[in-house]
């Protein structure tokens, strides 16, 4: 077991940034659930509008990318890359542009 490759994941700081944005989506009533998946190639934080649906967003940390600008990505339900960047904070600004007003 000691010879197996270390499983990649989000760092504590990365997860805190993602959960901060996720919390705003939850507070606004736009998002309902999330899931975290990890492999040797990538770690994915999936955001769901309803638990029984496909994720509406996937925040992806690419562990095997040769290009630095492909380290982080946001993908839509269809798998289209919405935004890509080497910096997670900059990438998450995409969600700050979204309207997270509270729903009455």
Segments (PLM) and residue ranges:
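Short aromatic-glycine-(Arg/Gly/Cys) micro-motifs in beta-strand/loop hairpins
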Residues: 3, 54-81, 97
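Basic nucleic-acid-binding interfaces
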Residues: 30-44, 48-55, 77-78, 90
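Negatively charged, low-complexity tracts enriched in Asp/Glu with abundant Ser/Thr
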Residues: 1-44
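Mixed-charge, Lys/Arg-enriched low-complexity segments
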Residues: 1-6, 81-104
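Intrinsic structural disorder
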Residues: 16-17, 28, 68, 74-76, ...
């Amino acid at each position: 077991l000691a010879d197996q490759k270390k499983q990649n994941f989000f760092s504590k700081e990365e997860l805190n940034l993602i959960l901060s944005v996720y919390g705003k989506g939850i507070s606004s009533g736009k998002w309902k659930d999330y899931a975290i998946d990890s492999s040797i190639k990538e770690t994915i934080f999936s955001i769901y509008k309803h638990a029984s649906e496909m994720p509406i967003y996937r925040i992806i940390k690419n562990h095997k990318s040769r290009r630095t600008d492909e380290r982080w990505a946001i993908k839509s339900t269809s798998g289209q890359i919405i935004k890509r960047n080497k910096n997670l904070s900059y990438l998450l600004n995409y969600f700050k542009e979204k309207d997270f007003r509270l729903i009455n």
